[in-house]
Amino acid sequence: MSYYTLWVIAFGLSMDAFAVSVGKGLTLADFCWKFTLKIALCFGLFQACMPLLGYYVGSHFSDYISEFDHWIAFALLCVIGINMIKMSVTNENSDDDPSDFSLRHLTMLGVATSIDALAMGVSFAFLKVNIWTAAAIIGITTTILSLFGVKAGHWLGDRIHKQAELLGGIILIAMGVKVLIEHRVFG
């Protein structure tokens, strides 16, 4: 598989992480590079590790995994999205402070946005792709796009203030529904 093809695949796989990064950037009262790097590196790491997992383990259980992977992503994104909407309606501001962004929360988002990368890893095994090169390209692409996503979300959040967390929650739920539809209709 050519490097060009790998970069295109990486860009496509990064779109969920980018959208969630925009959603989280919307909730930031003040832009913070520490938070931005934390989320970008988390998403990049998950996007790089999931193809490795898919390549080495997932290919043995591909029928089993494909039956429920989309439900996991859907549930994680919806739970987090509903919580964000609840926070926006009750005027709680737990997501405004980057230090409140827990490892558990980041892990849930990282898993939810990288389920497709797990499936791609299974495909890479069948195509005999160099998995280390593919994982590196996917991780780097996701990290860069997530950095831009948080920054873009914060920029937009500065302009719409009050509805930012509500919009962020809606984006996460929409991403969950998208994952479910893709796997149920096109899977």
Swiss-Prot record:
<protein>
    <recommendedName>
        <fullName>Putative manganese efflux pump MntP</fullName>
    </recommendedName>
</protein>
<feature type="transmembrane region" description="Helical">
    <location>
        <begin position="166"/>
        <end position="186"/>
    </location>
</feature>
<dbReference type="Pfam" id="PF02659">
    <property type="entry name" value="Mntp"/>
</dbReference>
<keyword id="KW-1003">Cell membrane</keyword>
<keyword id="KW-0812">Transmembrane</keyword>
<keyword id="KW-1133">Transmembrane helix</keyword>
<dbReference type="InterPro" id="IPR022929">
    <property type="entry name" value="Put_MntP"/>
</dbReference>
<keyword id="KW-0406">Ion transport</keyword>
<dbReference type="GO" id="GO:0005886">
    <property type="term" value="C:plasma membrane"/>
</dbReference>
<feature type="transmembrane region" description="Helical">
    <location>
        <begin position="129"/>
        <end position="149"/>
    </location>
</feature>
<comment type="similarity">
    <text>Belongs to the MntP (TC 9.B.29) family.</text>
</comment>
<keyword id="KW-0813">Transport</keyword>
<feature type="transmembrane region" description="Helical">
    <location>
        <begin position="39"/>
        <end position="59"/>
    </location>
</feature>
<dbReference type="GO" id="GO:0005384">
    <property type="term" value="F:manganese ion transmembrane transporter activity"/>
</dbReference>
<keyword id="KW-0464">Manganese</keyword>
<feature type="transmembrane region" description="Helical">
    <location>
        <begin position="65"/>
        <end position="85"/>
    </location>
</feature>
<dbReference type="InterPro" id="IPR003810">
    <property type="entry name" value="Mntp/YtaF"/>
</dbReference>
<keyword id="KW-0997">Cell inner membrane</keyword>
<keyword id="KW-0472">Membrane</keyword>
<comment type="function">
    <text>Probably functions as a manganese efflux pump.</text>
</comment>
<feature type="transmembrane region" description="Helical">
    <location>
        <begin position="106"/>
        <end position="126"/>
    </location>
</feature>
<feature type="transmembrane region" description="Helical">
    <location>
        <begin position="3"/>
        <end position="23"/>
    </location>
</feature>
